[in-house]
Curated annotation (Swiss-Prot):
This is Isoamylase 2, chloroplastic. It comes from Arabidopsis thaliana. One of its GO terms (biological process) is amylopectin biosynthetic process. It comes from the Eukaryota. Keywords: Carbohydrate metabolism, Chloroplast, Plastid, Starch biosynthesis, Transit peptide. Transmembrane segments: none annotated. The keyword Transferase does not apply. It is found in: Plastid, Chloroplast. Pfam families: Alpha-amylase, CBM_48, ISOA1-3_C. One of its GO terms (molecular function) is isoamylase activity.
C-alpha cells in the first residue's frame, strides 16, 4: 500500500490526517513478473500472475491474476480473476461485504477480508454494459482518508503517479469469467483503520474523459478498512459478540459529518486517530455507527459533529468541539478536564445476595442528604479519601438507623458541572467522580455499589434525585444535535436556556435508558424527578395533560418496582412550580403545599382548613386514585432556609420562605426567644411525623445546622458531626427517633395506604366547638382519631399481628397564649396518657411510656389540659383494667 503520513507534504486541508503519531509509509517499488501490462495513472505497470493469498479454503475467491506494487511494509495489488468459481467464505468473521447501486442501476459489491495481517479489497461491478469499441473500459478513481472525507491522504510510491492535488489514483477494472468487472487492492493491516473512497468512471473512445458514476445517493462509494460499519443498536459503546471489538453507536440527526475520535493516551487532549464516519456505510437513519477491533490500544473516545448549518468552508471539522457520548457508562477526564468515554467495561461487582428492602410507600421514612456534605467535615473522623464520598455515607449508616430512617434520598449524583452544582448535570449514565475515594469514575462506581449494598443490608432503600429537564451549559448534549435534544427554535421562553425537550422521542429514549441503567447496574430503589413540571412540556413547549415520557416511565416494566416521585422545584428559577401532575397511580409527589401550609400555621398566618388537610394526607391532591402515602411531606429542603433558620430569620428578603424569627432576627442570647424557637422546631417535627404521608427530613436539621439566613443552595454547610453531641442535637435526634417509633407502632393511623374515615375523626376548637376553618384569627385545632374496629382494620389492610389500636388526641396551639383543652370523655377502664407536649423541658417533653393525665377534681369526669403557647400535644388512650 502506498503511504501517507504527517511527515509527507499533504496540503493545507489536512492538518493531522486524524493521527498524532507518525505512521510512515515507505516508498513503493515496481514488482515485475510475467509481462502483461495495465495502466495505473500515467505509468505502465508490470504485473505477474500468481495465486492470491495462497490456498483460499476460507476465502471468497480461489485464484486471481493480479499486479503488485510492493514495498517493505505495504503494497497495492491489482488482481484479475482466472477462475469462474467463487465460494462463500467459511470464516465470515474475517469477511465484510457491502453492496451499492449506481444511479444507472449497476450493482457494485465490495468485499473486505483480513488475512495474514493484510486487508484485501475486491470490487465487483455487474449489470453494466460497456460500449463495443476497444477503448471502452471502467476505471475506479480512489483515495484514502481518515479524519476528513473531503481530503484524501497522499500516497507515496515508486514508479507510479498520483494526482498531486486530489491525491486520487485511477485503476482499471478487468472482466472476470462471470461477465462481471472486478479489481482488487491489498493494504498492510498495520496502516488501518482508514476509509477507501472511490467513484467509477466509464471511459470510451467517444468520451476519453469518462462519464462519472456515483451511488444512487449521488455520493462516492466509501468502504471502511480495519473496522466495520458496526450496528446502530444499542446506542453508546458495546462490545462485539466475542468481545473482540467495540461497537460505537451515536445519535445525531442534524449532523452532516460525525467524526469518531480515538485516544491512545489518557494524558493528552489530542486524539490519536480520527475517523470521519461515512453517511452511507456508517449511518442508519439518524444513528451513526462503527465497529473497531479492540486489539488497538485506544483508551478514550469522543465525537466531533458538524451540523447542516455549517458548510465545509464555514468551519473545519477539527474546529468542532469533541463531545462526550451521551450513553457512555464509563467516562474519564483528559488533561484539560474534558470528559470522554472510556474504552473499558464497568468492573464486575459481587452483589452477593443483595435484595431491595422493597418498603411500601406508606412505611417510608426518608432522609435527604448530599453525598459530599454528609461526611466532608473533619468532624466525621473519616479518612480523607473516604470523607465526602459514597463510602462515607456507608460508614455513617448507624446515624441513619438512629433516626429511624429506612430510605435515603441522595441529591443529584450524576456527573455535573462543578461550577453550577449537582442540579446541572452533563451526563446521565455515570456518578460524579468526586464521590469516589480516589476521585475517579471507577472508584465512584464501585463505592456507590458498596454503599447501596450496605444500606440494603440495613433495610434502607436508596432513592436518587434526578434532573432530566435541563443540562449544564457546556460539556453536556450541546453540539450533538441541539434541535433534537433542546428546544432550539421551538419555544421562546425555553430557547435561551438549557432545557431538554423531554417529550421528544430521542430524549425520551435517553431518559428511559438512564433510569433502567441505574436500576439494573446500581440497584437503585427509586427516583425523585427535580423540576418535574417541565416534564409536562410538549415538543414545542406547550403544556400536555398526558406527557409521553411521564406515562412511559409509569409503565416501563424494568421500573415497575421503583418509587417515582415528582418534585416541581425548579433549580433554574430557584422556586417550586405547582401543577396538576398526571400519575397513573404510580407517581408520588413532593408536597409543596404541605410545606407552605404548615409553615403558615405555625407562624400564625394560616387557616385551620389548610392544616387539617395536610395532616390528613392532602386529600385535595391525592384522592384521585392514589392515597396519602403518595404525599412526600417536607418542612425544609436543601434550597431555602434550614429548619433552625426558619424560626430565626424572617427579613423582607425572605418573604417567600414563610418563616418567623420568633421575636428577634438572627442570633440572640434572649432566653425567651431561644425557648420559643426550640418549641417551634419541635412543633414542625411533630406535625411532620404525625401527618399521613411520607416524612422527608433534610440533612442537618436534626442538629441545627444554619446558613445564617441564606436561602441559597450554595450556602449550605457540611454536616458537623460534633453538633449531634450538643444539647440541641441530642434532644432533637432523640425526639425524631421517638416519633418514628410512634409512627411504626401506630401504623394503623400514621402509615396508611388509604385516607382516614371521616366517621373516625372528630375536630375541635379550643372550647370543644366546631373549628372556624377559614378564620385567620383561629390558631388552635385539635382532633380525636378513633380506633377502627377489627373489620375496619382488615379492610384498610393493616399489618397483621399489630397491637390493638387505641384512640388518639392531638392538639395544635399556634397562638401566643395558653389554651385549656378538654379531652374527650372515655368509658370506664380507659384513661388518657400524654406522649408528647412540645412545651415541656427536655427530658420529659416526649415519653415512650407516657404520663397518665387525670381530672383535677376527683369527682370531675372531664380532663382539662392546659396547652402552653406555641405547642403541640399527643395523647393516647390506655386500658387501666388489664
Amino acid at each position: 500500500m502506498a503511504a501517507w503520513s504527517p511527515s509527507v507534504g499533504i496540503g493545507s486541508c489536512c492538518l493531522n490526517n486524524g493521527i498524532t503519531r507518525t505512521w510512515k509509509f515507505p516508498s513503493a517499488r515496481l514488482f515485475t513478473g510475467r509481462k502483461n501490462k495495465i495502466k495505473l495513472g500515467s505509468e505502465t505497470l508490470m504485473f505477474t500472475r500468481k495465486r492470491f493469498m495462497g490456498d483460499l479454503v476460507t476465502s471468497a475467491l480461489q485464484s486471481y491474476q493480479f499486479s503488485k506494487i510492493c514495498a517493505s511494509k505495504t503494497s497495492i495489488e491489482l488482481r484479475e480473476a482466472l477462475s469462474s468459481r467463487r465460494a462463500e467464505a467459511d470464516d465470515l468473521k474475517k469477511v465484510t461485504s457491502y453492496s451499492f447501486r449506481t444511479k444507472a442501476g449497476a450493482l457494485v459489491k465490495v468485499k473486505v477480508e483480513k488475512k495474514r495481517e493484510k486487508y484485501s479489497i475486491l470490487v465487483y461491478v455487474s449489470s453494466l454494459e460497456l460500449s463495443g469499441d476497444d477503448k471502452s473500459r471502467l476505471v475506479m478513481v480512489w483515495g484514502v482518508y481518515r479524519s476528513d472525507s473531503s481530503c484524501f491522504l497522499p500516497l507515496d510510491f515508486e514508479n507510479s503517479s498520483q494526482d498531486s492535488q486530489t491525491h486520487t489514483t485511477e485503476t482499471t477494472f478487468v472482466k472476470s469469467s462471470l461477465s462481471e468487472l472486478m479489481l482488487g487492492l491489498e493494504f498492510d493491516g498495520k496502516e488501518s483503520p482508514f476509509y477507501l473512497s472511490f467513484h467509477l468512471k466509464l471511459v470510451s473512445g467517444r468520451d476519453p474523459d469518462g462519464q462519472e458514476m456515483l451511488t444512487h445517493r449521488d455520493t462516492d462509494f466509501c468502504i471502511p478498512v480495519g473496522f466495520t460499519a458496526g450496528h446502530p443498536l444499542p446506542l453508546g459503546l458495546s462490545s462485539g459478540p466475542d468481545d473482540d471489538s467495540w461497537n460505537f453507536s451515536f445519535f445525531s440527526r442534524s449532523s452532516t459529518n460525525v467524526v469518531l475520535c480515538l485516544y491512545d493516551d489518557s494524558t493528552t487532549d489530542k486524539p490519536a486517530l480520527e475517523l470521519d464516519l461515512d453517511p452511507y456505510v456508517n449511518r442508519t437513519g439518524d444513528v451513526w455507527h462503527a465497529s473497531v477491533d479492540n486489539t488497538w490500544d485506544f483508551v478514550r473516545y469522543g465525537y466531533r459533529c458538524k451540523e447542516t448549518a455549517h458548510s465545509k468552508e464555514d468551519v473545519d471539522v477539527e474546529g468542532e468541539p469533541i463531545v462526550l457520548d451521551p450513553y457512555a457508562t464509563v467516562v474519564g477526564k483528559s488533561v484539560s478536564q474534558k470528559y470522554l468515554g472510556s474504552l473499558s467495561k464497568s468492573p464486575s461487582f459481587d452483589w452477593g445476595e443483595d435484595v431491595s428492602p422493597n418498603i411500601p410507600l406508606e412505611k417510608l421514612l426518608v432522609y435527604r442528604l448530599n453525598v459530599k456534605g454528609f461526611t466532608q467535615h473533619r468532624s466525621s473522623k473519616l479518612p480523607s479519601n473516604v470523607a465526602g464520598t459514597f463510602s462515607g455515607v456507608a460508614e455513617k449508616v448507624s446515624h441513619l438507623k438512629t433516626l429511624g430512617t429506612n430510605a435515603v434520598l441522595l441529591e443529584p449524583i450524576f456527573s455535573f458541572s462543578e461550577q453550577k452544582g449537582p442540579y446541572f448535570p452533563f451526563h446521565f449514565f455515570s456518578p460524579m467522580d468526586i464521590y469516589g475515594p480516589s476521585n475517579s469514575l471507577e472508584s465512584a462506581v464501585n463505592s456507590m455499589k458498596v454503599m447501596v449494598k450496605k444500606l440494603h443490608s440495613e433495610g434502607i432503600e436508596v432513592l436518587l434525585e434526578v434532573v432530566f429537564t435541563h443540562t449544564a451549559d457546556s460539556g453536556a448534549l450541546r453540539g450533538i444535535d441541539d434541535s433534537s435534544y433542546y428546544y432550539k427554535g421551538r419555544a421562546n421562553d425555553l430557547d435561551s436556556k438549557s432545557y431538554l425537550n423531554c417529550n421528544y422521542p430521542v430524549v425520551q429514549q435517553l431518559v428511559l435508558e438512564s433510569l433502567r441503567y441505574w436500576v439494573t447496574e446500581f440497584h437503585v430503589d427509586g427516583f425523585c424527578f427535580i423540576n418535574a413540571s417541565s416534564l409536562l412540556r410538549g415538543v414545542h413547549g406547550e403544556q400536555l395533560s398526558r406527557p409521553p415520557l411521564v406515562e412511559a416511565i409509569a409503565f416501563d416494566p424494568l421500573l415497575a418496582e421503583t418509587k417515582l416521585i415528582a418534585d416541581c422545584w425548579d433549580p433554574l428559577e430557584m422556586m417550586p412550580k405547582e401543577v396538576r401532575f398526571p400519575h397513573w397511580k404510580r407517581w408520588a409527589e413532593l408536597n409543596t403545599r404541605y410545606c407552605r401550609n404548615v409553615r403558615n400555621f405555625l407562624r400564625g398566618r394560616g387557616v385551620l382548613s389548610d392544616l387539617a388537610t395536610r395532616i390528613c394526607g392532602s386529600g385535595d391532591v391525592f384522592t384521585d386514585g392514589r392515597g396519602p402515602a403518595f404525599s412526600f411531606n417536607y418542612i425544609s429542603r436543601n434550597s431555602g432556609l434550614s429548619l433552625v433558620d426558619i424560626v430565626s430569620f424572617s427579613g423582607p428578603e425572605l418573604a417567600s420562605e414563610l418563616s418567623w424569627n420568633c421575636g428577634e432576627e438572627g442570633a440572640t442570647n434572649k432566653s425567651a426567644v431561644l425557648q420559643r424557637r426550640l418549641k417551634q422546631i419541635r412543633n414542625f417535627l411533630f406535625i411532620q411525623y404525625i401527618s399521613l404521608g411520607v416524612p422527608v427530613l433534610n440533612m442537618g436539621d436534626e442538629c441545627g445546622i444554619s446558613t445564617r439566613g441564606s436561602p441559597l443552595l450554595e450556602s449550605r454547610k457540611p454536616f458537623d458531626w460534633n453538633l449531634l453531641a450538643s444539647a440541641f442535637g441530642t434532644q432533637i435526634t432523640q425526639f425524631i427517633s421517638f416519633m418514628t417509633s410512634v409512627r411504626a407502632r401506630r401504623s394503623d393511623v400514621f402509615q396508611r395506604r388509604d385516607f382516614l374515615k371521616p366517621e373516625n375523626i372528630v375536630w375541635y376548637a379550643n372550647d370543644q366547638t366546631t373549628p372556624k376553618w377559614e378564620d385567620p384569627a383561629s390558631k388552635f385545632l385539635a382532633l380525636e382519631i378513633k380506633s377502627e374496629s377489627e373489620e375496619e382494620e382488615t379492610a384498610s389492610l393493616a399489618e397483621p399481628n399489630e397491637p390493638k389500636s387505641n384512640d388518639l388526641f392531638i392538639g395544635f396551639n399556634a397562638s401566643d397564649h395558653p389554651e385549656s383543652v378538654v379531652l374527650p370523655s372515655l368509658p370506664d377502664g380507659s384513661k388518657w396518657r400524654r406522649l408528647v407536649d412540645t412545651a415541656l423541658p427536655f427530658p420529659g417533653f416526649f415519653s415512650v411510656e407516657g404520663e397518665t393525665v387525670v381530672a383535677e377534681e376527683p369527682l370531675q369526669q372531664l380532663v382539662v389540659y392546659e396547652m402552653k403557647p406555641y405547642s403541640c400535644t399527643l395523647f393516647e388512650t390506655i386500658n387501666t383494667t388489664a
